[in-house]
């Protein structure tokens, strides 16, 4: 995969456009039916948002992207990764498999959707936020999902 949340049907970049610019199509190239990757990268760099996978190797048990049918073969070395980004204060997950992987790695309880679980690793205090999935398969309107994301972004100081 070339980039995170590249599927035109996924609403991650629409949620971010809606929150930061008041326009769900801010990062959308409607003609080409794709996202404006360069604008997204610039936005992420400007805001100090990093994206990464919780697994470096997975096995798809069925021919779809559902978390239910993904097996984590090799989890990402998250403590090592966090050591490379010392200013990171929060981790955000949008899927159950990522949440499970993080909770298992750091031995923390799962936060409810829209909230966080505090945890300490290597002497650092962090928060694990659990957001609603940006997939349209998750039964919630984009504007309602944006309420959860906005609250989290305000709490971590990005809004």
Model region roles, listed by residue range:
Residues 2-70:
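Short, surface-exposed acidic-centric catalytic microdomains
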Residues 28, 39-41, 72-73, 92, ...:
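Extended aliphatic helical segments
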Residues 24-25, 89-90, 110:
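Secondary-structure boundary/capping signal
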